[in-house]
Amino acid sequence: MKFIGIIPARYASTRFPGKPLAILGGKPMIQRVYERASLALEEVWVATDDTRIADAVKAFGGNVVMTSAAHRSGTDRCLEAYRNIGSDADVVINIQGDEPFIDPLQLKQIQSCFDDPDTRIATLVRPYNPEGGIEGLENPNSPKVALDAEGYALLFSRSVIPYLRGVERREWPSRHQYYTHIGMYAYRAGTLAEITALPQLSLIHI
């Protein structure tokens, strides 16, 4: 099975414009992400709509493909990149462009999900450490995931899920195993095309 890693990278972030080019230890952030991803994947590309990012990737010898500036999400950008590259990879891994310390082992783990021929989409979670307390659990920058008994994701939320009725809120982390999301998704190529064609629900913008 063939995998391709695609790193969607935008310059015009509302919270941190130019984030992919922020210098970390003498290298642009996008280079840090690219190099870490390359430790686990034979083929990695940066997908961007900005020539400044494209030039930075070319400068360190990375693969880069230009995409439209009109995409609704990084997922849509990944699909266009996959098509523009002319890739024949079976699985596309969407790698966040602001994760300079991404663990190559996690990339290997998400690839292993596709050992099951029925897997169409995969993502990763980590058990929440109760020592972080309720304050850490409530951090909206750390999305939570509710899982079923077989480990399938039921719901993603920036709020704490599930709600523990009848339990003091500060006790929640020690009374239930919560999970937080690791921002990485992998899709079989056909499934990626299918989901990007679906209309977005209003909930995604909340």
Labelled PLM ranges:
Residues 8, 94-96, 124-125:
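Short beta-strand segments
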Residues 2-48:
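N-terminal glycine-rich phosphate-binding loop and ensuing alpha1 helix
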Residues 204-206:
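Conserved small/polar residues in nucleotide/adenosyl-binding loops
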Residues 45, 52-109:
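Short phosphate-binding loop-to-helix
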Residues 15, 101, 186:
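Short aromatic/basic micro-patch
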Residues 104-198:
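Conserved core of the sugar-phosphate nucleotidyltransferase
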Residues 41, 87-89, 117-121:
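Short, high-confidence coil segments that cap the C-terminus of an alpha-helix
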